[in-house]
């Protein structure tokens, strides 16, 4: 419904015709962008709450920005819960409580589609081609576990292509992390036995596993195979040590322990993961709320968003009750197509102790978060004042580029906010050299600046094109690595897209010395700040993060291009010889490290051709390291 009124007047007008049933409502701003999505058991009653006199500032600001109000009737509260979750995920409204870090947790994957299964880290949906163990709360935990497993069981971690190309054992074999099945150092039966042992260990069948290993050790000893028996003995010791460190629990098997705490309108929800009785780590999530927000409301929003992405255990154990628990259970079960789930809030016993531990950890995490947030808030106030921004910046985008005389050019966007860098929002733009200097109305003084201007134009054009579909990611401030000329480019592209975002260009001073940075703004004199000011140090940190990210991705692109093209560019190296080289040495890197004499051992490679390969590849390596 579209009216010429807005805010509370619009809501009052809508209440008259609002249905008295369950459903979902959407609030839209003057540009018809969704700014809030809510659900209600009775829509009419829920909308009435928005015309009360005791609303907090955030809710009042949301209502004042509402120019359109839409609602969708549902058949049940569960259906309303599901629809609300889907719409929040789709529109990411700025006034909703959003789960910003929604990346999936890593797993350990044991492949099942190969005679010699690999043991690797995996992130994504569980597929049918493997056995999955986890989830783990962090990359550190999954990597540590994998390292321990490789030391104990020595299963391969290489790709199938790498496995098939081996003619001799790799470094993993030399450091006793792999049995080198690729070159026949272990047979299928013995390897399969190791695979079963890994499964038993990860499924916490450790007592039976250790009993079987002890029995095998005795058999090997009686057969005078002492070296093999000693290896089994070491495996038993290592398993006992790892088991002691992880601390297997009898209280829970497959469960997520969720504790919510709050302070000063900030919430922390800490999720501790337990699978097969083992702790798989914990991760905190932080939210800002309104004065009228409740634990129940924040928890409900979190649960629906969290379990759209993450694996659901058989039990969710929390420190706080929620409204309509049964509806929440049904909604999560439908989202994930599962049949078994319980949500409990224990008050005594072993589970209650686990919840209390999670609550203590959540409070510590929140304290650390708030200390960091206070420092950043002071900086944000300083930025608002320095650049005359309409409000405290919530999203800052920093841009830079990197290239080698125009080749392998990349532009990057780094994102920062009140809680630091938001690395999942970083973007890399691979740049085409064809349009670097086309269409510029600026008089260019040299080719390097021409490239920089063209690169910036490309990056901003692509960024603003995408921004049309992501209005919730509109930056409060843009910082561009560049000088006065870059101001014109930014303004030119903004005018083209009819976008008005505060921006500043930041350049190094004379002799490009750090600490003498100059800030360039539209219609203002060049500004130089004292290098010891906290705000100047913060701007340098932002600039350096973008600069380092640009260089890193430029080098990656350059290295990737060299690896793909180097062998193909050598006269006399066709597909047959290229395959022979890679098969003999096992990898492109090994070919690069080979001597001329080693190269001649490959079938079809003469002395003169080996010299040519050696010289060209080493020249490329020198370029890549420059």
Swiss-Prot record:
Keywords noted in UniProt: Cytoplasm, DNA damage, DNA excision, DNA repair, Excision nuclease, SOS response
Transmembrane feature ranges: none
Domain called UVR: residue spans: 207-242
Function field: The UvrABC repair system catalyzes the recognition and processing of DNA lesions. UvrC both incises the 5' and 3' sides of the lesion. The N-terminal half is responsible for the 3' incision and the C-terminal half is responsible for the 5' incision.
Family to which this protein belongs: Belongs to the UvrC family.
GO molecular function, one term: DNA binding
Name of the coding gene: uvrC
Residue span, GIY-YIG domain: 20-97
Pfam families, per database record: GIY-YIG, HHH_5, UVR, UvrC_RNaseH, UvrC_RNaseH_dom
GO terms for biological process, alphabetical: nucleotide-excision repair; SOS response
Domain of life: Bacteria
Protein name: UvrABC system protein C
GO cellular component assignments: cytoplasm; excinuclease repair complex
HAMAP family found in the cross-reference section: UvrC
Known partners and oligomeric status: Interacts with UvrB in an incision complex.
Subcellular location: Cytoplasm
NCBIfam families referenced in this protein's UniProt entry, alphabetically: uvrC (TIGR00194)
């Amino acid at each position: 419904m579209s009216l010429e009124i807005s805010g509370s007047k619009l809501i009052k007008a809508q209440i008259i015709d609002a249905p008295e049933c369950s459903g979902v409502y959407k609030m839209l701003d003057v540009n018809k962008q969704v700014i809030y999505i809510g659900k209600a058991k009775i829509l009419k009653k829920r909308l009435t709450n928005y015309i009360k006199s005791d609303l907090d500032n955030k809710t009042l600001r949301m209502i004042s920005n509402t120019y359109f109000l839409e609602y969708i009737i549902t058949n049940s509260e569960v259906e309303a819960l599901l629809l609300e979750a889907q719409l929040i995920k789709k529109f990411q409204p700025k006034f909703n409580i959003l789960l910003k870090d929604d990346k999936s947790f890593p797993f350990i994957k044991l492949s099942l589609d190969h005679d010699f299964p690999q043991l690797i880290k995996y992130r994504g949906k569980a597929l049918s081609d493997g056995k999955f163990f986890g989830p783990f709360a962090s990359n550190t935990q999954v990597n540590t576990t994998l390292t321990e497993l490789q030391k104990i069981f020595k299963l391969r971690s290489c790709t199938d292509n790498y496995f098939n190309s081996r003619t001799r054992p790799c470094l993993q074999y030399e450091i006793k992390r792999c049995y080198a099945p690729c070159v026949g150092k272990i047979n299928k039966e013995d390897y399969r036995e190791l695979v079963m042992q890994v499964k038993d260990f990860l499924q916490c069948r450790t007592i039976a596993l250790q009993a079987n290993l002890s029995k095998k050790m005795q058999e090997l000893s009686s057969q005078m195979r002492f070296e093999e028996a000693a290896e089994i003995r070491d495996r038993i010791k290592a398993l006992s040590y790892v088991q002691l460190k992880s601390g297997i629990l009898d209280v829970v098997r497959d469960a997520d322990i969720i504790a919510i705490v709050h302070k000063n309108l900030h919430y922390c929800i800490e999720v501790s993961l337990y699978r097969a009785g083992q702790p798989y780590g914990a991760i905190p999530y932080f939210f800002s709320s309104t004065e009228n927000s409740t634990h129940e409301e924040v928890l409900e929003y979190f649960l629906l968003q969290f379990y759209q992405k993450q694996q659901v255990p058989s039990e969710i154990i929390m420190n706080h009750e929620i409204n309509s628990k049964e509806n929440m259970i049904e909604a999560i079960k439908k989202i994930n197509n599962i049949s078994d789930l319980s949500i409990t809030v224990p008050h005594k016993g072993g589970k209650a102790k686990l919840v209390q531990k999670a609550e203590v950890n959540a409070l510590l995490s929140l304290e650390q978060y708030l200390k960091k947030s206070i420092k950043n808030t002071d900086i944000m106030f300083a930025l608002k004042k320095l650049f005359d921004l309409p409000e405290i910046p919530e999203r800052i985008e920093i841009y830079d580029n990197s290239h080698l005389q125009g080749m392998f050019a990349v532009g990057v966007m780094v994102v920062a906010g009140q809680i630091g860098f938001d690395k999942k929002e970083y973007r890399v733009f691979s740049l085409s050299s064809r349009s670097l200097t086309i269409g510029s109305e600026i008089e260019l003084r040299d080719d390097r600046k021409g490239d920089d201007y063209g690169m910036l134009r490309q990056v901003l054009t692509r960024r603003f094109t995408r921004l049309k579909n992501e209005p919730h990611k509109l930056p409060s401030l843009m910082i561009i690595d560049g000088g006065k000329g870059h101001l014109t480019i930014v303004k030119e592209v903004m005018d083209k897209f009819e976008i008005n975002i505060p921006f500043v260009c930041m350049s190094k001073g004379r002799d490009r010395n750090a600490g003498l940075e100059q800030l360039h703004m539209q219609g203002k004199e060049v500004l130089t700040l004292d290098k010891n000011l906290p705000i100047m140090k913060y701007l340098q940190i932002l600039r350096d993060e973008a600069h380092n990210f640009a260089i890193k991705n430029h080098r990656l692109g350059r290295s990737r291009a060299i690896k793909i093209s180097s062998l193909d560019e050598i006269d006399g190296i066709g597909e047959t010889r290229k395959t022979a080289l890679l098969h003999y040495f096992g990898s492109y890197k090994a070919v690069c490290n080979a001597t001329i004499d080693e190269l001649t051992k490959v079938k079809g490679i003469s002395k003169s051709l080996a010299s040519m390969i050696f010289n060209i590849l080493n020249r490329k390596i020198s370029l890549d390291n420059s």
